[in-house]
Amino acid sequence: MTAPGRRSSTFSRLLRHGFTDPSAAERLLESAELEPVKADPVLLEALGATADPDLALLGLVRLVEAQDDHTARRELLDTLIAAKPLRDRLLGVLGASAALADHLARHPRDWQALVTYEPRDLHPGVEEFERGLAEAADPVSLRVAYRRCLLSIAARDVCGTTDLAQTAAELADLATATLRAALLIARTAAPDDAAICRLAVIAMGKCGGHELNYVSDVDVIFVGEPANGADEGKAVQAATRLASHMMRICSETTVEGTIWPVDANLRPEGRNGPLVRTLSSHLAYYQRWAKTWEFQALLKARPVAGDIGLGEEYVATLAPLVWQAAERDNFVADVQKMRRRVVANIPAAEIERELKLGPGGLRDVEFAVQLLQLVHGRADASLRSGTTLDALKALAAGGYVGRADAVQLDEAYRFLRTMEHRIQLFRLRRTHLVPEDDADLRRIGRSLGLRADPITDLNREWKRHATVVRRLHEKLFYRPLLDAVAQLAPGEARLSPNAARERLVALGYADPAAALRHLEALASGVTRKAAIQRTLLPVLLGWFADSADPDAGLLNFRKVSDALGKTPWYLRLLRDEGAAAENLARVLSAGRLAPDLLMRAPEAVALLGDGDGGRGGLEPRGRAQLEQEVLAAVGRAGGSEQAVTTVRGVRRRELFRTAARDIVSSYGTEETPAEADQGALVDLVGGAVSDLTAATLAGTLRAVVREGWGDTLPTRFAVVGMGRFGGYELGYGSDADVLFVHEPREGVDEQEAARAANAVVSEMRRLLQIPSADPPLLIDADLRPEGKSGPTVRTLTSYEAYYRRWSLVWESQALLRAEFVAGDEELGQRFIELIDPFRYPAEGLGDDAVREIRRLKARMEAERLPRGADPTLHTKLGRGGLSDVEWTVQLLQLQHGWVEPGLRTTRTRPALAAACAAGLLTGEDAAILDEAWVLATRVRNAVMLVRGRAGDTFPSDGRELAAVGRYLGYGPGHVGDMLDDYRRITRRARAVVDEQFYGA
């Protein structure tokens, strides 16, 4: 009996060596079977190095016990202690695989397969495995020989002698040898059938890809042809019998279990189709009936057994069809849909443990790689590998996948596949579910070298790699670049000059010669930059062609690329961020404004990357965030000119952000449809530009005051937005209509205060109009009391006196849009409180005031509409245009604002909605006016985006007019429809205006 002290010492040593049940382990060590070696410390050390020391010890005892006699047991134990390579391999297998331990217990002499380890055995291939299976003459002996070969693969794997790729390749080679052995058994059993047919076995899936798992269905396709002049029908029948027998030999369960199922369901028509077809029958099916996924499956087709010549002919015949698959309608969408369907079919209880099929799993990597291969492999034969890791390496070498992304995907795939191998190796069962039992997780973690805290570390590493796969899979697999590339003719994924010229003509480029020069400048050369450009250009050309001016799009792309081409992140952004390339294409070809803004600061391209639907970087920033940025910049600047230069730079960047968001939302992308709510886009642009203008004025005001007076101006000073500015409805080229109000600080002379206030206004105007690369901001104060004849700045008291005594009805109407925007907020709010009684007069407007407003409106229509302008197409002063709608709404505000709080807003659309809610307009009339106002505003925004300068009517230039149409959602050739729709919508609005405003 073991002394307590000794037991305690052994118990502790076992714990230190990783045993989870030291008591049971101690009993096994004390067993008679291990008596000759139990005192040798190398045994305990070797057991402690295994994935599961308890399991390895139990397996060793069973193996020793199973030896035929004492001599055999002594040979095993002596070799175990003397030969470290055997000790590591044997105990490594026993600690990782209960199934292989069972095999060794049934076949106790098979441990000797792990003794010989000559250098040539480090990487055995099909021939070596065929020799290992050569003596197997029946299904049972084939299984035993197969397991013996599997022992050597598993031993090299768990000891780290081979990596994941080599292990998977060896498993595929063993499968190949096994299929050949099984077919030989079948042919031997039916020599007459063998004599009249040629039968080729084509490996598919992971076996075909030379990347098999320990336990996996072996996917195959059979091709049969007559031999020796035999009848084709009889030959196919004979080949079918041989194929069926071969499948049974591998798949059926015997006293030695099974090897793996042979699955022929990837054949034409699946399980409903004939098991064996002739080559011509295969070709006819794929030419006429095959679905997209069937071509994807053929990526991995590889002849492995039977008539290899026939198999190679099969692969060569079908290969062209594989590389034409990307031309099929909806090819990319079909592949993506199939992947999503696989995920959707995973039981909810299993999805978090699905190592293969779940999000971030192995299939995500495989699908992404295969899709990229099918799209780009048409023009690049280097991508045509059936092995995932080899294909990924080739994709990275060709510039189709970022190098860093490829490294991360490779690492993640290797980890997840190795984890899958360890899970399957334990019981030699086909599974992709990560076990939940701690003992299983501990064994897997230790087998992967995670010894400190195996369970926690395994879960952390697994989730980390799955997260990487999910992120990169979404970038690579779902990036909309592929859809467009997949629709190009073969050979155009990377353009040759001749193909480019033909493509340019077909796409309608007005100057193909100039466009080709741009392409040659962008795509020529052997640099990585040029390779990536060649990949992007076919896609971009198609997107440019969707616009009204593809030549401008390509020219602008060249300008941006010349400016940023040496910047590492630029091409990486376009290639890897799904939204960026298409967003850039839309922006560069939609007109002059956005490209002009971008050319002045090309780094703003970074805003076009992925986010919420590809628009996350384009979401306009709020006023508070903008003011914080500009005020901080002013604080850092050395003087007012430098400060305002920085502020104007921010304004330029944010104008680009808003314009790009507007364009992308108006055009839509491959992933995200065009914004259906046109009013929402109008509100977005108006609010964003108004917030930006307010922040610009705030920063400029701060810079001027700091330069001239330090921290404190002698008078409190506020800027009040008017017109579209006060209504949050500014367009891209709008001036800033404002009023300036000041109030002398205590003890400051009024004249001194007035001089300071006027000096501030003059300096703000000067700084915002200094010629520079940034667009100027014009300040217009003509809506002030007495107009251009009145003082530019007034005190609060002066404003109050004027409005009480002299104010005309049009001035009360103008005040409906007054809103504090910059400067002293308390003073600004007091000004708003001051004017409320004038813009929302108690008891509303009298009849005389209503008649005066109507008279003013009629005179404006008659006098201000430009000579020769079409009144049906003028967005501001034309029939049913902006002025019509706004004056109608404002009349209701003047009449009813005093009793209807909802009408007390500076914004047209909310006021219109409030008038409807108050019963002042019917829902139909309100909708008609809203539709016309939104459309007219959209047209004005479009004109500015297209021409780069403001305009109130549709362009006369045909290409510019078409560009406005594309922005509004009208396709090529539908400019006439756009004008007809505009006239129809505004005509209906004018009818409402006549009734509501003029009382007709």
Swiss-Prot record:
Query: What are the protein's GO molecular function terms?
Result: [glutamate-ammonia-ligase] adenylyltransferase activity; [glutamine synthetase]-adenylyl-L-tyrosine phosphorylase activity; ATP binding; magnesium ion binding
| An annotated GO BP | regulation of glutamine family amino acid metabolic process
Q: Identify this protein by name.
A: Bifunctional glutamine synthetase adenylyltransferase/adenylyl-removing enzyme
Q: In which domain of life is the source organism classified?
A: Bacteria
A single Pfam family it belongs to is GlnE
Residues of the region (Adenylyl removase) are: 1-481
Chain intervals for the UniProt region annotation (Adenylyl transferase)? 487-1000
The alphabetized UniProt keywords are: ATP-binding, Magnesium, Multifunctional enzyme, Nucleotide-binding, Nucleotidyltransferase, Transferase
What this protein needs as a cofactor is:
Mg(2+)
* Coiled-coil zones: none
Q: Does the keyword Lipid metabolism apply?
A: no
The record's GO CC annotations read: cytosol
Q: What is its EC number?
A: 2.7.7.89, 2.7.7.42
InterPro entries the UniProt entry points to: GlnE (IPR023057), GlnE_rpt_dom (IPR005190), NT_sf (IPR043519), PII_UdlTrfase/GS_AdlTrfase (IPR013546)
Q: What class of enzyme is it?
A: transferase
Q: Catalytic activity annotated for this protein?
A: [glutamine synthetase]-O(4)-(5'-adenylyl)-L-tyrosine + phosphate = [glutamine synthetase]-L-tyrosine + ADP; [glutamine synthetase]-L-tyrosine + ATP = [glutamine synthetase]-O(4)-(5'-adenylyl)-L-tyrosine + diphosphate
Protein family: Belongs to the GlnE family.
Q: Does the keyword ATP-binding apply?
A: yes
Sum up the protein's function in the record's words: Involved in the regulation of glutamine synthetase GlnA, a key enzyme in the process to assimilate ammonia. When cellular nitrogen levels are high, the C-terminal adenylyl transferase (AT) inactivates GlnA by covalent transfer of an adenylyl group from ATP to specific tyrosine residue of GlnA, thus reducing its activity. Conversely, when nitrogen levels are low, the N-terminal adenylyl removase (AR) activates GlnA by removing the adenylyl group by phosphorolysis, increasing its activity.
